[in-house]
Amino acid sequence: MFAVLPVLLALAVLLGSCTAPTACMEEATAFRAALCNAGGCSFQAEITADHGDYTTTFTLQCRYDTQSGALDFTVAAPESISGIAGTVDTDRKTITFAATALETPLLAAEKLAPVALPQVLGESWAGSYIAQAGSDHAYTVVLYQNGYEDDTLQVETWFSEGAPVYASIWYDGVSQAGVKLSDFQLY
């Protein structure tokens, strides 16, 4: 299980190294506006979910719709489950599979399925509270707070040239997953 220290270090980066915090916040809000105006995005997400004593890694091809808040996905890797497709609704509790269903251990105190993580990302980018925005010299890092009270997820997203390239998702001070993002496109 990941310790709380990485969150504190990331926050130190956000607070300490950005020479123009206003510019970083403007970049975060410009990304949100572009995403919402486009109506959605597509991306590949390589997810490493932390289950405490072990991790699982899988890759999804994703399509997030800002209007409905739903995410369509197709498993790209590992090959043994490649091709499984489904939809994650906005409540993250309803996952509809096209044919074969996946069963994975839940994250965030048994409240979040790993295949729902990209939906959390899309929802955060499109409308969650932007708590911090800063720079670590090569990337703009934005911290979103997704949810309320006991159900709040912290979503850190690293942007390069205006597109998300990595995200980490935290619940109650504990890392739940890291997500490498590629092939990001607005549609």
Residue ranges and their predicted role:
Residues 42-45, 57, 88-90, 167-172, ...:
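Extended beta-sheet lipid-handling architectures
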Residues 16-67, 80:
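N-terminal leader/targeting segments and the immediate start of mature chains
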Residues 1-16:
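Sec-dependent bacterial lipoprotein signal peptides
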Residues 45-53, 75-77, 97-101, 143-147, ...:
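Short acidic, glycine-rich loop/turn motifs
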Residues 33-35, 60-66, 86-88, 126-134, ...:
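Short, exposed beta-strand/loop patches in secreted or surface proteins that constitute
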Residues 72-74, 127-187:
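Gly/Pro-enriched, hydrophobic low-complexity segments
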Residues 36, 47, 95-150:
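Flexible, processing/modification-adjacent segments and terminal tails
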Residues 61, 65-119, 174-177:
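An acidic-aromatic
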